[in-house]
Amino acid sequence: MTTEEMVVDVSQDWVLACDVQQGFMQAPCSVSESFDYSARCRQIRALGGDCYSVLPLKDDCMALVVGDASGQGLAAALMIANVQSSLRTAALFTGDDLAALLKAVNHQVYASSSENRYATMFYGVFDGSTGILRYVNAGHNPPIVIRRDGSMYCLETGGAPVGLFPDSEYREGSIQLETGDMVFAFTDGLIEAANQDGDEWGVHGLLKAAACEAQCSQEAGDLVDLIFNSMDDFSKEHQTDDATLAVVRVI
């Protein structure tokens, strides 16, 4: 094989890998009639270490996954693909036990990853019939619930990042959601966006934008757009890490 042929072959493989990764990120329409949701992942390279998925479950339930692998580029993309694959496999055997699910994912990821490779992850199950959100936070930036009255709550219960330790244990948390409440799940690339002076947008910037826009916008998709625009205005679109945001609104 000539050098030119090798370049073409690698380029084709790279495009295929990008397509596969984008296929993992899904927020299909009509997953649940009880929730309005939207998500976006903005990567700094063709392949990245962030991911999100909105998955339909039985009985008007849906799952939200937001993850962030350590590192950047191809290595991070492979790690997050491993996490997503492990999650789908483990879900077949653990049923509704979210703590057991994350423990199984951690075991699989740790066994199949190199040393010091890990990923943070938030996994939440929204029940449309009860309004209850059950979740496990595996070392991830705590998602924020902004209630209709303006009060806020962080979703912190869980355990260590997956793949970091062989025998991590996890705990399940839950919260009762009401009509008009919103959940914001994100990766650190969103809140660590910095301006020219090196100041980070931070959780404060996210909360300010989210709380403000939540009062004047009714659509989750609009909120995602407006929050990314607010971050860009602050950082002048200077992005050094993958940034992901998912918004779920209780209808």
Which residues does each predicted region cover?
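Terminal helices and disordered tails flanking the catalytic cores of nucleotide-processing hydrolases
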Residues: 209, 216, 225-229, 233, ...
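… and, occasionally, acidic/histidine-rich disordered N-termini of signaling adaptors
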Residues: 2-184, 226, 237-251
